[in-house]
């Protein structure tokens, strides 16, 4: 059973106990009221009270005492039910704790597996990038590379924007234009890609020649293969000791980022839910 199952049972038991405690309080109030009624009857009896009236009042008192006994019987029954449910509540809380510990261990195991998988992919991408850089350097020296493989002249970028295409209209296009309007060189696919270009080569070139990589992390981003390719390339550069990745969260929660990449969730990020494009640009100016 998962923790939600036990939590629901605990909530039900706690409600049952609270209802029983209220019933006990109601019966205690009834008992107090009946004792007051008995006292009231006693105060009406004096030496002039006739035998018939006295007998009538005694029957009245007997009725109140019977009601009091009934209240006490109910209270005892409610208290017994509370004791039973409290014992059951204690067991359910222990079961909840065990379920939570089991779920936490599973989450940690899943995160560890993901980190190992990510580390393996990063190593592969790192070797791939190193090979590309070495090939580009070698072909440049031997003048054997075409203008399609390495743009001429070589261009340096302040920022490479990694994003999912679904986020272009929401945030990415406006951010890219705002950065360019503030004098930054920006690698953004709508600025750089032309018909017939090799997407992989252009991305590799942008990643290799950008000072920073802005990563727009969104629900769409974490599902894309190309964005993961770009992110792995940036992580490979960071492993050489350079701060590269600048995360911006867009319509995504910390738990979602944590499931995608625990190491990425640990980075200080800007968030479009609280930062405007102008705020983001100002923060990037301070790098």
From Swiss-Prot:
InterPro entries: TIR_dom, Toll_tir_struct_dom_sf. It is an enzyme of class 3 (hydrolase). Disulfide bonds: none annotated. Keywords: Hydrolase, NAD. It holds the Pfam family TIR_2. Residues 155-287 form the TIR domain. The keyword Ligase does not apply. The keyword NAD applies. Changing residue 226 to A: 50% 2'cADPR produced, production of ADPR rises. Changing residue 226 to F: 50% 2'cADPR produced, very little ADPR made. NAD(+) hydrolase (NADase) that cleaves NAD(+) into nicotinamide and 2' cyclic ADP-D-ribose (2'cADPR). Homodimer. This is 2' cyclic ADP-D-ribose synthase BtTIR.
């Amino acid at each position: 059973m998962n923790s939600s199952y036990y939590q629901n049972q605990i909530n039900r038991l706690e409600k049952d106990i609270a209802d029983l405690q209220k019933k006990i309080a109601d019966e205690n109030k009834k008992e107090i009221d009946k004792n007051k009624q008995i006292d009231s009857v006693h105060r009406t009896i004096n030496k002039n009270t006739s035998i018939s009236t006295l007998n009538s009042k005694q029957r009245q008192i007997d009725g109140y005492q019977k009601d009091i006994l009934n209240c006490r019987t109910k209270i005892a029954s409610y208290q017994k039910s509370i004791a039973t449910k409290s014992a059951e509540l204690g067991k359910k809380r222990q079961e909840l704790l065990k379920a939570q510990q089991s779920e936490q261990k599973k989450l940690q195991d899943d995160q560890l597996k993901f980190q190992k998988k990510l580390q393996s992919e990063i190593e592969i991408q790192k070797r791939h990038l190193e090979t590309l850089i070495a090939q580009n350097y070698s072909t440049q020296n031997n003048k054997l590379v075409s203008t399609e493989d390495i743009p001429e002249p070589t261009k340096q970028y302040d920022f490479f924007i990694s994003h999912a295409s679904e986020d272009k209209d929401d945030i990415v296009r406006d951010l890219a234009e705002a950065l360019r309007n503030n004098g930054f060189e920006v690698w953004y696919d709508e600025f750089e890609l032309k018909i017939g270009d090799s997407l992989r080569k252009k991305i590799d070139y942008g990643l290799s020649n950008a000072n920073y990589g802005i990563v727009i992390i969104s629900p769409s981003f974490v599902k894309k293969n190309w964005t993961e390719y770009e992110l792995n390339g940036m992580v490979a550069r960071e492993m050489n000791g350079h701060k590269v990745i600048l995360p911006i969260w867009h319509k995504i929660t910390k738990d979602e980022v944590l499931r995608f990449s625990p190491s990425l969730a640990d980075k200080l990020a800007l968030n479009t839910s609280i930062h405007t494009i102008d705020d983001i640009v100002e923060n990037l100016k301070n790098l």
